[in-house]
Amino acid sequence: MNTFIKIILTALLVLIASFPYFQNGQAPGGLSELQYMGIIPSIILVVGFFTAIAFYCYTLQKVLQNVKPDNRTRKPKSIWFMYLIPFNFIEDFFIVIDVSNSLKNEMKTNKNLTKFGDFGLTLGIGWSVAQLFSFIPNIAGQISGLIGIILWIIHWVLLHRINKVLQQPTPNK
């Protein structure tokens, strides 16, 4: 059922995101900025972005690997679903929620984690929502994309800090 919902939401997103391209005239889309940069800088930017995503996924995978298996709500390798475009735009929400829930479960036996609040859930949902709004074909989409990248980086840094704490010995109860 969960997969069915994800597929329906992904199809809806693709329909909404492609709508401006079927209108008369050329509507500036989410990637229209790349045409102004030229081919080589655009390729470098895209490769750099996907490389950053790989490091982010690796960080999330390590976080889940450092969570006791009984406390995980997702398998560590499933983090790499972030590369399944366009499915990832919906899956990102589920990944962020599952990582946060796994950390909440882990906190019950690892009191070192109590200082991390919602374990980045708000940041993760924030960057995921901003990522969706970045499909708006105007300045609002561009601003949303920038906000999404900023929230994503802050989320990444937080999870890196959490990962360091997970690698420390657990204090006695």
Residue spans for each PLM region:
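Membrane-interface extramembranous regions at the lipid-water interface
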Residues: M1-I39, I44, G48-Y83, F87-L132, ...
